Amino acid sequence: MTVLSQFIYYAYEKGDITMHVRSFQLSDVNSVTELMQIALSEECYKETVGAFARQLSWDSGLIVVAEEEGEIVGALIGTIDQNHGCYYRIAIHPDHRRMGIGKSLVESMEQRFQQRKVSRIWVAGDKHNSAAMPLYEAMGYGASQILQAFQKLSILAPH
Protein backbone atom coordinates (compact mmCIF):
# COMPACT_ATOMS: atom_id res chain seq x y z
CA MET A 1 0.00 0.00 0.00
CA THR A 2 1.22 3.47 -0.86
CA VAL A 3 -0.28 6.69 0.44
CA LEU A 4 -0.38 9.45 -2.17
CA SER A 5 -1.30 12.77 -0.52
CA GLN A 6 -4.88 12.23 0.70
CA PHE A 7 -5.57 9.26 -1.53
CA ILE A 8 -5.07 5.67 -0.54
CA TYR A 9 -3.75 3.54 -3.34
CA TYR A 10 -3.61 -0.25 -3.36
CA ALA A 11 -1.96 -2.24 -6.08
CA TYR A 12 -1.24 -5.86 -6.77
CA GLU A 13 0.14 -7.81 -9.66
CA LYS A 14 -1.02 -11.23 -10.83
CA GLY A 15 1.03 -12.41 -13.73
CA ASP A 16 0.90 -9.66 -16.32
CA ILE A 17 -2.17 -7.97 -14.79
CA THR A 18 -1.91 -5.04 -12.40
CA MET A 19 -4.91 -3.95 -10.35
CA HIS A 20 -5.09 -0.85 -8.23
CA VAL A 21 -7.73 0.70 -6.02
CA ARG A 22 -8.08 4.44 -6.16
CA SER A 23 -10.47 7.27 -5.48
CA PHE A 24 -13.35 7.76 -7.85
CA GLN A 25 -12.78 10.50 -10.44
CA LEU A 26 -15.52 12.33 -12.31
CA SER A 27 -14.29 10.77 -15.56
CA ASP A 28 -15.21 7.35 -14.07
CA VAL A 29 -18.96 8.04 -13.91
CA ASN A 30 -19.87 6.25 -17.16
CA SER A 31 -17.58 3.28 -16.47
CA VAL A 32 -18.92 2.83 -12.94
CA THR A 33 -22.51 3.14 -14.14
CA GLU A 34 -21.86 0.49 -16.82
CA LEU A 35 -20.15 -1.75 -14.25
CA MET A 36 -23.16 -1.50 -11.94
CA GLN A 37 -25.49 -2.42 -14.82
CA ILE A 38 -23.40 -5.53 -15.53
CA ALA A 39 -22.60 -6.56 -11.94
CA LEU A 40 -25.91 -5.85 -10.20
CA SER A 41 -29.39 -7.19 -10.84
CA GLU A 42 -31.75 -4.81 -12.62
CA GLU A 43 -33.70 -4.18 -9.41
CA CYS A 44 -30.52 -3.60 -7.40
CA TYR A 45 -29.15 -1.26 -10.07
CA LYS A 46 -32.34 0.82 -9.99
CA GLU A 47 -32.12 1.08 -6.19
CA THR A 48 -28.41 1.91 -6.26
CA VAL A 49 -28.09 4.48 -9.04
CA GLY A 50 -29.86 7.26 -7.10
CA ALA A 51 -27.75 6.64 -3.99
CA PHE A 52 -24.63 6.65 -6.19
CA ALA A 53 -25.59 10.05 -7.63
CA ARG A 54 -26.33 11.51 -4.18
CA GLN A 55 -23.06 10.22 -2.73
CA LEU A 56 -21.20 11.69 -5.72
CA SER A 57 -22.70 15.10 -5.08
CA TRP A 58 -21.98 14.96 -1.34
CA ASP A 59 -18.59 13.30 -1.08
CA SER A 60 -17.08 11.37 -3.98
CA GLY A 61 -14.11 10.50 -1.75
CA LEU A 62 -16.27 7.73 -0.31
CA ILE A 63 -16.49 5.96 -3.65
CA VAL A 64 -13.51 3.81 -4.58
CA VAL A 65 -12.82 1.92 -7.78
CA ALA A 66 -10.62 -1.01 -8.74
CA GLU A 67 -8.90 -0.67 -12.07
CA GLU A 68 -7.12 -3.31 -14.13
CA GLU A 69 -5.30 -2.39 -17.29
CA GLY A 70 -7.27 0.87 -17.52
CA GLU A 71 -10.67 -0.82 -17.07
CA ILE A 72 -12.81 -0.33 -13.97
CA VAL A 73 -13.62 -3.81 -12.68
CA GLY A 74 -14.93 -2.99 -9.21
CA ALA A 75 -16.50 -0.18 -7.22
CA LEU A 76 -17.58 0.35 -3.63
CA ILE A 77 -19.98 3.07 -2.55
CA GLY A 78 -19.57 4.10 1.06
CA THR A 79 -21.24 6.82 3.05
CA ILE A 80 -21.04 8.44 6.46
CA ASP A 81 -24.30 9.02 8.26
CA GLN A 82 -24.44 10.38 11.83
CA ASN A 83 -20.72 9.67 12.23
CA HIS A 84 -21.18 6.02 11.24
CA GLY A 85 -19.40 4.68 8.17
CA CYS A 86 -21.42 2.35 5.98
CA TYR A 87 -20.42 0.09 3.11
CA TYR A 88 -23.50 0.66 0.98
CA ARG A 89 -22.96 -1.23 -2.28
CA ILE A 90 -20.11 -3.19 -3.83
CA ALA A 91 -20.04 -4.14 -7.51
CA ILE A 92 -17.42 -6.41 -9.06
CA HIS A 93 -17.44 -7.32 -12.74
CA PRO A 94 -18.50 -11.00 -13.04
CA ASP A 95 -15.29 -11.88 -14.93
CA HIS A 96 -13.15 -10.50 -12.09
CA ARG A 97 -14.80 -11.96 -9.01
CA ARG A 98 -12.97 -14.06 -6.41
CA MET A 99 -9.65 -12.36 -7.19
CA GLY A 100 -9.32 -10.21 -4.06
CA ILE A 101 -10.79 -7.07 -5.62
CA GLY A 102 -13.64 -6.84 -3.11
CA LYS A 103 -11.24 -7.21 -0.20
CA SER A 104 -9.00 -4.46 -1.58
CA LEU A 105 -11.98 -2.13 -2.03
CA VAL A 106 -13.23 -2.76 1.51
CA GLU A 107 -9.74 -2.24 2.98
CA SER A 108 -9.41 1.06 1.15
CA MET A 109 -12.83 2.27 2.32
CA GLU A 110 -12.14 1.10 5.87
CA GLN A 111 -9.05 3.30 5.95
CA ARG A 112 -11.06 6.26 4.68
CA PHE A 113 -13.58 5.73 7.46
CA GLN A 114 -10.77 5.50 10.02
CA GLN A 115 -9.17 8.70 8.71
CA ARG A 116 -12.50 10.46 9.18
CA LYS A 117 -12.77 9.01 12.67
CA VAL A 118 -16.20 7.43 12.33
CA SER A 119 -17.50 5.96 15.58
CA ARG A 120 -18.66 2.71 13.97
CA ILE A 121 -18.63 0.93 10.60
CA TRP A 122 -21.73 -0.82 9.28
CA VAL A 123 -22.47 -3.01 6.30
CA ALA A 124 -25.78 -2.25 4.58
CA GLY A 125 -27.57 -5.58 4.64
CA ASP A 126 -30.32 -6.26 2.15
CA LYS A 127 -31.34 -8.95 -0.31
CA HIS A 128 -29.01 -7.45 -2.90
CA ASN A 129 -25.95 -7.66 -0.65
CA SER A 130 -26.38 -11.32 0.32
CA ALA A 131 -23.69 -12.48 -2.13
CA ALA A 132 -21.21 -10.02 -0.62
CA MET A 133 -21.86 -10.99 3.01
CA PRO A 134 -19.24 -13.79 3.09
CA LEU A 135 -16.63 -11.19 2.03
CA TYR A 136 -17.58 -8.83 4.86
CA GLU A 137 -17.75 -11.71 7.36
CA ALA A 138 -14.28 -12.94 6.30
CA MET A 139 -13.01 -9.42 6.96
CA GLY A 140 -14.37 -9.43 10.51
CA TYR A 141 -17.76 -7.79 10.03
CA GLY A 142 -20.14 -10.05 11.90
CA ALA A 143 -23.88 -9.94 12.45
CA SER A 144 -23.57 -7.03 14.89
CA GLN A 145 -22.20 -4.83 12.09
CA ILE A 146 -24.92 -5.65 9.56
CA LEU A 147 -27.33 -2.75 9.33
CA GLN A 148 -30.70 -4.19 8.33
CA ALA A 149 -32.69 -0.98 8.80
CA PHE A 150 -30.46 1.03 6.51
CA GLN A 151 -33.40 2.41 4.54
CA LYS A 152 -32.98 5.54 6.67
CA LEU A 153 -29.52 6.25 5.28
CA SER A 154 -29.36 9.78 3.93
CA ILE A 155 -28.09 8.69 0.50
CA LEU A 156 -31.26 6.67 -0.05
CA ALA A 157 -33.74 9.53 0.24
CA PRO A 158 -33.38 12.97 -1.28
CA HIS A 159 -33.64 15.80 1.23
Language-model features and meaning:
Residues 2-27, 156-159:
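Conserved N-terminal entry element of GNAT/NAT acetyltransferase domains
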Residues 113-125:
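Conserved GNAT acetyl-CoA-binding A-motif
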Residues 23-88, 112, 143-146:
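Acetyl-CoA-dependent GNAT
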Residues 123-132, 151-155:
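Conserved beta-strand-loop-alpha-helix junction that forms the acyl-donor binding cleft
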